[in-house]
Curated annotation (Swiss-Prot):
Keywords: ATP-binding, DNA-binding, Metal-binding, Nucleotide-binding, Repressor, Transcription, Transcription regulation, Zinc, Zinc-finger. This is Transcriptional repressor NrdR. It comes from the Bacteria. Signal peptide: none annotated. The keyword Cell membrane does not apply. Its cofactor is Zn(2+). Residues 49-139 form the ATP-cone domain. Binds 1 zinc ion. The gene is nrdR.
Length: 149
C-alpha cells in the first residue's frame, strides 16, 4: 500500500483488528521510508447479482427499489426499523448466496414476500396483492386462507 505522506510503496502492518461486528478489518500501518503511521480499513466487496426482469431486460440490483416496496407494504404497521433492516439484510444475503451473476425478478419478489410473511401478515397481503396483481376480492381471500394454513 502506498504511504499517504510520501507515496512510498513499502509499508508494514503494525496492528490488525476486527471492527464493525467482524465485517471490517482495521489495520495500523507504518511507512518504511518516512516512518509515518496511518490507519486503513478493509471490507469485502459484495457484488449483487443483476436482475432479469419479466420482459427479459437485465438491470443492476436496485436496493432502494426493493426497500421502497417493503416500506410501502409496512406503512403504518407496528414493525421496528431494526426488524426491517434485518429482513433487508437477509434478502440480500440470500441473493448473494445463490452464487448466480443474474437472478430473475420473481426470485427477489418471493424472497421479499417470505420476509414480510415473517414480519407482518397484513404487510405480506399488501405486497402480494400488488406483486401478484390480484384482480378481485376472491384472490385476497385465497391468499389469506393460505396464510392461515
Amino acid at each position: 500500500m502506498h504511504c499517504p505522506f510520501c507515496s512510498e510503496n513499502d509499508t508494514k502492518v503494525i496492528d490488525s483488528r476486527l471492527v464493525a461486528d467482524g465485517h471490517q478489518v482495521r489495520r495500523r500501518r507504518q511507512c518504511l521510508a518516512c516512518s509515518e503511521r496511518f490507519t486503513t480499513f478493509e471490507t469485502a466487496e459484495l457484488v449483487m447479482p443483476k436482475v432479469i426482469k419479466s420482459n427479459g431486460n437485465r438491470e443492476p440490483f436496485d436496493e432502494d427499489k426493493m426497500v421502497g416496496g417493503i416500506q410501502r407494504a409496512l406503512e403504518k404497521r407496528p414493525v421496528s426499523a431494526d426488524s426491517i433492516e434485518l429482513a433487508i439484510s437477509m434478502i440480500k444475503s440470500q441473493l448473494r448466496a445463490t452464487g448466480e451473476r443474474e437472478v430473475p425478478s420473481q426470485m427477489i419478489g418471493n424472497l421479499v414476500m417470505d420476509q414480510l410473511k415473517e414480519l407482518d401478515k397484513v404487510a405480506y397481503i399488501r405486497f402480494a396483492s400488488v406483486y401478484r396483481s390480484f384482480e378481485d376480492i376472491r384472490e385476497f381471500g385465497e391468499e389469506i386462507a393460505r396464510l392461515e394454513d
